[in-house]
Amino acid sequence: MPENPSPLPAARSKRPLVIGAAAAVALIGLAGFFGLARLKRPAGDAACTAAVEVAKKIAPLAHGEVAAVTMASAPLRLPDLAFEDGDGKPRKLSDWRGKTVLLNLWATWCVPCRKEMPALDELQGKLGGKDFEVVAVNIDTRDPDKPKNFLKEARLNRLAYFTDQKAKSFQDLKNVGRALGMPTSVLLDAQGCELGTIAGPAEWASEDAIKLIKAAMKPATAGF
């Protein structure tokens, strides 16, 4: 008698049916998955159309030290991220409406983040004011004093301290495809619309970055 007998004819005939049924279920599952993925894509915001035009105009300035910035190609208003200031008071991203904003998410466990912070601090010192703000949100989920101590020891005193100990800001940006790694920075116009995004560090105090941000601060109708 053979060691591995062939399946009985009836069983053999059922195997393709089982495989076919499994394949059908898999295809249905994939269709559902991709359907959900499409639903999760940001629908866009018609009010942010002007920001896309600005992004197109200033795109040639995204070179050199800021070459990794991806300029906006579709209208997107960022979620109204919620976090706290250094005194524990609740803040929202919309608090800065009326200003051009460089939103930055950072953490002390992120080496590129720590290296980038001095440049962000310098940028705030150079351009920060009534028309522009660096909003750097720390997303450490443990030891709330650690990021404060880091800023103090590094003598970075021009950046205001903001924290999101649940790291929900990162998840909210991830949900709209704008948080792929750390650090993450998003350049926003005065209406909270995306102008450009970068996953990774940049020399934000460089001449290249200053020129890009100054151009972003101009009205949408201005020439560049």
Annotate each PLM feature.
Residues 214-223:
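Short, low-complexity, Pro/Ser/Thr/Gly-rich segments in the mature regions of secreted, periplasmic
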Residues 114-155, 165-173, 211, 224:
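Structural microenvironment flanking redox-active thiols in thiol-disulfide oxidoreductases
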Residues 1-77, 222-224:
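N-terminal targeting signals for export/organelle localization
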Residues 70-75, 80-101:
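A short beta-strand-turn-helix
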Residues 76-78, 96-98, 129, 156, ...:
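Extracytoplasmic
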Residues 100-101, 132, 183:
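Alpha/beta-hydrolase fold active-site loops
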Residues 153-158, 164-215:
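Thiol/disulfide oxidoreductase modules built on the thioredoxin-like
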Residues 97, 105-122:
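Conserved redox-active cysteine motifs that mediate thiol-disulfide chemistry
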